[in-house]
């Protein structure tokens, strides 16, 4: 765009140039780099969204393996008998073939470089792949291609580039830096510690990226979950430091369905950890795929659908854009309330991130109840009693806990209006009240706003408890403001059905752009039941963006990084 920048290379010939910001542009540009009379021209350079994709085999898994998956059946003919997703493979393949804008996509695959005494040898970088069709991507990550297609479409044909740095079978401790590894594994002589960090991340140089994709965990389900938690946070910190963005958004892929005797029962607990980490860490989001995956293939073929969900998550939380098209948008619905009347046989479940929920076709599976936490009884049927509430009856004398979709391989049963399944949960306590709490929820409420209804003639004592970091903001009963004395409100022999709404806000006040956090706990005689609030929106959600369709004239800085024949141009996020 007529820009001219100069800089000085270091003793190894490395340099970094920061260009003035440019809008996303699908028209190929020419970039010329010159030094000492020599000149190198890079043609057909696009300006758009760049992501870093890392992890193990399900991030590295190439399109070629997907295209020729018949070899799986040939190796084990019995495999095809229950391999339903194999039959669906053709439809996924058609989706890749039908995409007409491959010229908008760019892919860079980092080579694994050799090491000598833990020090990376110099190695030549790969070149960017500039595809004309799916046929040019045989050796490119299936996950990267699927995400790039979906994101480009949801952003109305903005160019998308993916930098892939992934190694099949790698464990998370291989991707963290040496200092973090020394803290987590003191005195451990494991030669794989930080191995991928040294030979798969450091050699890339400093690219500018909009966000990161992390598809990893299959090799760590056998290990200690607390160790994984520490390693993930170390990986997150180092990845953000490397890309010079302390709030870099990260999308993680929750392990989908898979069944193998060697890890039987381990995947559900690991999925719970992945969800917990996404909620603990700022600007980290997880894609739930509890209804995806293959029975006996650890490399599922339905990554196109998985990545559609990832792109829908990015659209809402990274770009802050509304979406009215078909397909996934936002995050998976989660159970935010479980209750029953004392002595009653009906249990109610309410969901967040859903305007309405649907039962899947056929017999519903996945939900089970217990009265003693020892033996869980499957719940065979459900009834929709509100836009985002379902109920069920059970023959158990009373229900104290529920768990949902706790399996290695099974059938998910509830979806929201965007086709996203309800996220699995393990041992959620069912609250018991002495009064009837209606399941019906008023429509048109803002995200997370819960309204609890109390039937006429009831007595109740409510305690409202804010989650950590939040303070009380307002209480209303049937739309009228009410006082909250010491966190409690007494309701005696109410003469009509009433709606009780309590709203909290972040301690110290909140921006007008933030959604109100709401009732963290509503209790009769029961103990505290903290509900998960909706994820705080990214700082990008309400900021200007340079992508097409956002209507912003703001120019953000662009960073250019050149390594051998590799080049990336990406929009730098505003702090």
Spans of features found by a protein language model:
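Short coil/turn motif common to extracellular beta-sandwich-like domains
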Residues: 342-346, 433-434, 455-461
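Conserved N-terminal submotifs of small, disulfide-stabilized extracellular modules
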Residues: 432-455, 505-507
């Amino acid at each position: 765009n007529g820009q001219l920048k100069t800089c000085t290379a270091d003793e190894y010939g490395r340099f970094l140039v920061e260009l003035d910001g440019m809008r996303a542009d699908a028209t190929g540009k020419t970039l010329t780099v010159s030094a000492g009379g020599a000149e190198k021209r890079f043609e057909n350079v696009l300006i758009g969204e760049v992501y870093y994709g890392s992890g193990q085999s399900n991030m590295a898994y190439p399109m070629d393996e997907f295209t020729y998956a018949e070899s799986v059946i040939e190796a084990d003919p019995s495999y095809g008998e229950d391999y339903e997703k194999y039959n669906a493979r053709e439809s996924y393949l058609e989706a890749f073939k039908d995409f007409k804008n491959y010229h908008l996509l760019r892919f860079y695959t980092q080579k694994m470089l050799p090491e000598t005494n833990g020090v990376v040898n110099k190695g030549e970088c790969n070149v960017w792949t500039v595809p004309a069709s799916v046929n040019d991507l045989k050796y490119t990550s299936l996950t990267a291609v699927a995400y790039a297609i979906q994101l480009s479409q949801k952003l109305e044909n903005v160019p998308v580039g993916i930098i892939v740095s992934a190694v099949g079978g790698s464990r998370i401790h291989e991707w963290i830096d040496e200092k973090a590894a020394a803290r987590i594994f003191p005195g451990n002589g494991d030669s794989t510690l930080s191995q991928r960090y040294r030979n798969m991340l450091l050699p890339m140089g400093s690219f500018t990226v909009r966000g990161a994709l992390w598809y990893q965990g299959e090799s760590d389900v056998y290990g200690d979950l607390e160790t994984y938690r520490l390693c993930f946070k170390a990986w997150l910190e180092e990845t953000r430091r490397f890309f010079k963005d302390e709030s870099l958004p990260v999308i993680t892929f929750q392990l989908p369905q898979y069944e193998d005797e060697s890890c039987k029962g381990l995947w559900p607990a690991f999925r719970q950890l992945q969800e917990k980490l996404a909620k603990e860490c700022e600007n980290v989001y997880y894609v739930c795929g509890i209804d995806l995956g293959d029975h006996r293939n650890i490399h599922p073929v339905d990554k196109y659908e998985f990545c559609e969900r990832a792109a829908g998550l990015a659209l809402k939380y990274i770009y802050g854009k509304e979406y009215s098209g078909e397909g996934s948008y936002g995050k998976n619905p989660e159970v935010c309330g479980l209750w029953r009347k004392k002595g009653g046989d009906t249990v109610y479940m309410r969901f967040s991130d859903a305007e309405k929920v649907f039962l899947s076709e056929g017999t519903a599976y996945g939900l089970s109840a217990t009265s003693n936490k020892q033996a869980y009884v499957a719940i065979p049927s459900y009834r929709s009693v509100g836009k985002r509430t379902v109920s069920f009856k059970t023959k158990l004398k009373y229900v104290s806990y529920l768990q949902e979709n706790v399996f290695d391989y099974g059938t998910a049963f509830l979806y929201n209006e965007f086709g996203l399944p309800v996220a699995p949960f393990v041992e959620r306590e069912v609250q018991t009240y002495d009064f009837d709490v209606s399941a019906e929820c008023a429509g048109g409420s803002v995200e997370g706003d819960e309204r609890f209804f109390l039937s006429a003639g009831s007595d109740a004592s409510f305690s409202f408890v804010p989650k950590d970091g939040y303070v009380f903001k307002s209480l209303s009963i049937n739309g009228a403001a009410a006082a909250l004395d010491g966190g409690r409100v007494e309701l005696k022999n109410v003469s009509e059905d009433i709606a009780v709404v309590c709203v909290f806000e972040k301690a110290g006040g909140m921006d007008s752009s933030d959604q109100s956090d709401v009732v963290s706990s509503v209790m009769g005689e029961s103990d505290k039941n903290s509900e998960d609030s909706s994820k705080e929106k990214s700082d990008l959600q309400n900021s200007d963006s340079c992508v097409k369709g956002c209507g912003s004239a703001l120019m953000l800085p662009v960073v250019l990084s050149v390594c051998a024949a590799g080049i990336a141009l990406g929009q730098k996020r505003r702090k």
